[in-house]
């Protein structure tokens, strides 16, 4: 099946704003198009944007990304996207952080010490400990241990395999929000859920049918305080 992109990044400020089901936040990070392509494959209406109106009026919002924590926070603040992220998460709009997008939701990262994260959720991003025989970054497929009935994982098998690419990992302050863990040198908090704010360290858009099921579960969520 043809999974080519039907929309490029373009200049979001030159087009007339409209309402989309899912807004994918554009902050000059990598991997945005892979997320859009996966959502289009699922038949979901989505747009890559940094337009405030499109983000605020979307039913759901995704913050993907591959890159460095400090650079990403600089870009979010440059476009004042940190403000709209705080707004939509406070409104309990379904929000999904992916990989770097997960890390940015927390307090700070060993990767960019002294740089404050978004503080949407409590926890720190730590470097994966060195261990003999394990390469860092952690790249490849790994199994998840599901716990605490995460809505993203509804209908999935007990220990699904998903795709990771990262050198830093989440240590959430509240383990009740942790919905999946994986093992790689240490216990990694691989997915969290707090209200309608969700985040995955792995890449659902690169995780085959399991990842598509996770994205579909996110797309089916109700927004606001419903």
Per-segment meaning from a language model:
Residues 1-16:
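Single conserved hydrophobic/aromatic residue that forms the stacking wall/gate
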Residues 22-44, 205-206:
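N-terminal beta1-alpha1 ligand-phosphate binding loop
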Residues 46-57:
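Short acidic low-complexity segments
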Residues 67-139:
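Cysteine-nucleophile active-site neighborhood
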Residues 108-184:
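Pocket-forming structural segment of enzyme catalytic cores
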Residues 187-193:
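Short, surface-exposed beta-strand/loop micro-motifs that present aromatic residues
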């Amino acid at each position: 099946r043809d999974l080519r992109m039907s929309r490029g990044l373009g200049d979001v400020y030159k087009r007339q704003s409209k309402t989309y089901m899912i807004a994918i936040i554009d902050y000059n990070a990598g991997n945005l198009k892979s997320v859009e392509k996966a959502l289009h494959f699922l038949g979901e209406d989505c747009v890559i944007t940094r337009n405030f109106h499109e983000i605020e009026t979307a039913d759901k919002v995704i913050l993907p990304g591959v890159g460095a924590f400090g650079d990403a926070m600089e870009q979010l603040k440059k476009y004042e996207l940190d403000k709209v992220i705080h707004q939509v998460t406070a409104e309990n709009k379904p929000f999904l952080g992916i990989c770097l997008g997960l890390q940015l939701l927390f307090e700070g990262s060993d990767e960019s010490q002294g740089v404050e994260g978004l503080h949407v959720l409590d926890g720190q991003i730590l470097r994966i400990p060195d261990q003999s025989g394990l390469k860092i970054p952690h790249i490849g497929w790994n199994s998840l241990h599901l716990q605490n009935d995460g809505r993203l994982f509804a209908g999935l098998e007990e220990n699904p395999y998903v795709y990771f690419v990262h050198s830093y990992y989440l240590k959430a302050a509240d383990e009740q929000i942790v919905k999946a863990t994986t093992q790689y040198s240490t216990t990694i908090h691989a997915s969290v859920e707090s209200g309608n704010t969700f985040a995955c360290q792995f890449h659902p858009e690169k995780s085959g049918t399991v990842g598509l099921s996770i994205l579909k579960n996110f797309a089916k969520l109700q927004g606001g305080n419903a």
